[in-house]
């Protein structure tokens, strides 16, 4: 699998093999996606990652890399299917784009990794999911505002020192059916 490597403005620099991602330098960025999956009760699905990979044991939303020349939406739909067993059809009907290319940095061991993250929101009727046991240890459903506080606190893989309010407001709007921007495949 190849990953595209970008500069901070999102311009493609080069392609690397997945195994080389920890070798990117401080001026290079990868692209990824993340999704607030919300049930009818207004609870957000929080994953606890298994103790391996880039974010061992961390709390997270459904997230992943953009592989090769995938679009952001294709990557998000793939991750929803892989990690949670959500079908392409369901994801395409209800997924909403909330923010594109949020600069995001986190430590993996001693290495600082930089991502340009596209944030999505998926409101669904069911809380039933099928976990990808190779990546996810367990899930919990937390109320929307409690999830926002968890992210702000730095207890997830998301950086603590970022102003998330614009994203949180868009997620609230999706939950309250005020956000109607569908994504294109």
What is the predicted role of each segment?
Residues 9, 39-42, 50, 123-128, ...:
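Short loop segments at secondary-structure junctions
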Residues 32-65:
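A glycine-rich, hydrophobic loop/mini-helix early in the fold
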Residues 35, 62, 96, 118-120:
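A structural signal for short, well-ordered beta-strand segments
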Residues 18-19, 50, 135:
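Residue-level structural signal for beta-strand termini and adjacent loop
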Residues 46, 61-97:
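The catalytic Nudix box helix
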Residues 55-58, 68, 101-104, 111-185:
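Nudix hydrolase/Nudix homology domain
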Residues 1-34, 38-40:
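Acidic, metal-coordinating catalytic segment for phosphate/diphosphate chemistry
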């Amino acid at each position: 699998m190849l990953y595209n490597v970008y500069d901070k403005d999102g311009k493609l620099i080069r392609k690397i093999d997945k195994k080389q991602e920890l070798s990117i330098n401080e001026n290079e960025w990868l692209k990824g996606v993340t999704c607030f999956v919300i049930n009818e009760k207004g609870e957000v699905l929080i994953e606890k990652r298994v103790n391996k990979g880039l974010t061992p044991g961390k709390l997270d939303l459904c997230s992943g890399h953009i592989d090769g020349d995938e679009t952001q939406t294709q990557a998000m739909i793939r991750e929803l299917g892989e990690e949670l067993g959500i079908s392409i059809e369901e994801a395409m009907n209800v997924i909403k784009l909330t923010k594109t290319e949020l600069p995001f940095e986190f430590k993996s061991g001693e290495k600082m990794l930089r991502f340009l993250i596209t944030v999505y929101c998926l409101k669904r009727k069911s809380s039933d999911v099928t976990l990808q046991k190779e990546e996810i240890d367990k899930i919990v459903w937390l109320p929307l505002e409690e999830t926002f506080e968890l992210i702000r606190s730095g207890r997830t893989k998301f950086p603590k020192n970022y102003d998330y309010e614009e994203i949180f407001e868009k997620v609230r709007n999706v939950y309250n059916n005020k956000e109607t921007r569908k994504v294109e495949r």
